[in-house]
């Protein structure tokens, strides 16, 4: 019997597996795909958020700030690219300045250091190519960018060296409670474990609902991006956000650790969790909204 099974070979699954590998226990990662980082971990904004927008007092706020502080040491230990390029939240209308101040207050409450509101000539000093329509920005210098693929692979490699077993092409079909813990059923047989960590991304609700009386439903939200050539990579140096809405942080513009320029994402609720296509309308939306920033 295993002590812990982790379902999902993404960044959350392998961050968990690496931590478990520090202890004297038997752990395994189960993944339906043929390799690591095949889900959401391979397709995201690659941002290490500073932590100014999470509601103070929540687990998200605490984990965001704590995780941000870990990144310098973690990237050095595992040798993956990470850069603290800082982030800016743009305000285009003076009537929305109270919203920017609210984010600053949240940052202070969450323990995010050195966050301040910048206006006037200092905006252009930070980012010369920002739109002249920007009235003020929230500047969070601890924001960063990372390579999500190399980070996930590095976590996986370190987990494996430390004794965690990997089972790829092993789709979990059901989970049964037992007297000792859980029996995880897969297309390649059953795995018994005392504990199961559910790190299955957009499919986490399905595995939760197999064993928990508290049912969950995850509505998948698709985002489309445009990744530009390295010739455009230095157009901005910070990660540029527009003021957030209930749907998220909106269309961002950011350099990548590889020297490209990334813009996006859209935010579209969908029914098919496997739908990852891009569309002409979606990419046009990215271009139109990104142009508001710079």
Regions found by a protein language model. Give the residues of each.
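Glycine-rich FAD pyrophosphate-binding loop
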Residues: 22-42
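Short Gly/Ser/Thr- and Asp/Glu-enriched loop/turn motifs at secondary-structure junctions
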Residues: 43, 83-87, 179, 221-223
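Dinucleotide-binding Rossmann-like beta1-alpha1 core, especially the glycine-rich loop
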Residues: 46-126, 250-251
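Helical element adjacent to the flavin cofactor pocket in flavoenzyme catalytic cores
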Residues: 138-195
């Amino acid at each position: 019997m295993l002590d812990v099974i982790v379902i999902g070979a993404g960044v959350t699954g392998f961050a968990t597996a690496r931590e478990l590998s520090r202890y004297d226990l038997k752990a395994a990662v189960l993944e339906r795909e043929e390799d690591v980082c095949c889900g959401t971990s391979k397709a995201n904004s690659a941002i290490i958020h500073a932590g100014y927008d999470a509601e103070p007092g929540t687990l998200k706020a605490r984990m965001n700030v704590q995780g941000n502080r870990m990144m310098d040491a973690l990237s050095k230990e595992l040798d993956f690219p990470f850069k603290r390029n800082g982030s800016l939240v743009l305000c285009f209308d003076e009537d929305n300045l109270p919203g920017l101040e609210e984010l600053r207050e949240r940052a202070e409450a969450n323990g995010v250091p050195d966050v301040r509101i910048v206006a006037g000539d200092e905006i252009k000093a930070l980012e010369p190519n920002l739109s002249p329509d920007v009235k003020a920005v929230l500047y969070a210098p601890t924001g960063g960018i990372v390579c999500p693929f190399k980070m996930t692979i590095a976590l996986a490699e370190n987990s494996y060296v430390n004794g965690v077993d990997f089972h790829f092409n092993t789709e979990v079909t059901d989970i049964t409670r037992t007297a000792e813990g859980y029996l995880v059923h897969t297309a390649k047989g059953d795995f018994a474990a005392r504990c199961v960590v559910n790190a299955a991304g957009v499919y986490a609700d399905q595995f939760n609902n197999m064993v928990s009386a508290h049912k969950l439903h995850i509505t998948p939200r698709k985002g489309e991006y445009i990744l530009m050539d390295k010739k455009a990579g230095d157009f901005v140096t910070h990660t540029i956000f527009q003021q957030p809405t209930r749907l998220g942080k909106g269309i961002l513009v950011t350099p990548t650790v590889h020297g490209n320029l990334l813009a996006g994402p859209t935010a579209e609720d969908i029914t098919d969790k496997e739908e990852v296509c891009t569309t002409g309308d979606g990419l046009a939306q990215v271009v139109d909204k990104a142009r508001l920033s710079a």
